[in-house]
Amino acid sequence: MGSLQMQTSPESDNDPRYATVTDERKRKRMISNRESARRSRMRKQKQLGDLINEVTLLKNDNAKITEQVDEASKKYIEMESKNNVLRAQASELTDRLRSLNSVLEMVEEISGQALDIPEIPESMQNPWQMPCPMQPIRASADMFDC
């Protein structure tokens, strides 16, 4: 609407007061725009700094988590190895028990005396089956050193 007023009042074009007011408005608008641009740059700079800090924190967290996963993997491999050793020992002991039981059966046949020969427990024949129902084990998180 300001441009319409400028066209409708031809005497204002030559009026130095009008030119001064217009120049003053342009100067104020230019200063305001500069200040707004400066604030915008400051906001962007702060956002960039915040994002850089967040990236640093996330990288640190990622490194810690990776370290924990590696440690847990090592412990898992160690436990798996121990478990395999225990399974092999259980199998060997089961075989030895069978062998001893067969010797006892031969002694029983030869001597004619009845011997109390224990049967091999089901849990020894099928080690993946628990001999008794599973009961919850209470343990604290500190116990695992994760």
UniProtKB/Swiss-Prot annotation:
Disulfide bond entries: none
Location(s) in or outside the cell: Nucleus
Residue ranges annotated as motif Nuclear localization signal: 26-33
UniProt keyword Transcription, yes or no: yes
Superkingdom as given in the UniProt entry: Eukaryota
Effect of residue 72 to P: Impaired heterodimerization with bZIP proteins
Subunit (UniProt): Forms heterodimers with other bZIP proteins such as BZIP1, BZIP9, BZIP10, BZIP25 and BZIP63. BZIP heterodimers form complexes with ABI3 that enhance G-box element-binding to increase the expression of seed maturation (MAT) genes.
Name used for this protein in its record: bZIP transcription factor 53
Source organism (scientific name): Arabidopsis thaliana
Lineage, highest ranks first: Eukaryota, Viridiplantae, Streptophyta, Embryophyta, Tracheophyta
GN (gene name): BZIP53
